[in-house]
From Swiss-Prot:
TM helices/strands, residue ranges: 21-43
Its job: Antenna complexes are light-harvesting systems, which transfer the excitation energy to the reaction centers.
Keyword Cytoplasm: no
Residue numbers binding a bacteriochlorophyll: 19, 37
InterPro entries: Antenna_a/b, Antenna_beta_CS, Antenna_beta_dom_sf, LHB-1/5, Light-harvesting_complex
Leader sequence residues: none
Keyword vocabulary terms for this entry: Antenna complex, Bacteriochlorophyll, Cell inner membrane, Cell membrane, Chlorophyll, Chromophore, Light-harvesting polypeptide, Magnesium, Membrane, Metal-binding, Transmembrane, Transmembrane helix
GO biological process: photosynthesis, light reaction
Quaternary assembly: The core complex is formed by different alpha and beta chains, binding bacteriochlorophyll molecules, and arranged most probably in tetrameric structures disposed around the reaction center. The non-pigmented gamma chains may constitute additional components.
PROSITE patterns reported for this sequence: ANTENNA_COMP_BETA
Organism: Rhodoblastus acidophilus
Protein name: Light-harvesting protein B-880 beta chain
Residue ranges annotated as Periplasmic topological domain: 44-54
């Protein structure tokens, strides 16, 4: 049987490389999502003001 140090079978260097890519991709996704929400809010706010939707 092979001696594996991890359940996934990837080396520590491969895991760190994947983690760095995952974190950068997730960060980019969050930035794009926040920007989209800000633009949508500027276009059409989804919480009514003090006078309602009028």
């Amino acid at each position: 049987a092979e001696d594996r140090s991890s359940l996934s079978g990837v080396s520590d260097a491969e895991a760190k490389e994947f983690h760095a890519l995952f974190v950068s991709s997730f960060t980019a996704f969050i930035v794009i999502a926040v920007l989209a929400h800000v633009l949508a809010w500027a276009w059409r706010p989804w919480i009514p003001g003090p006078k309602g939707w009028a």
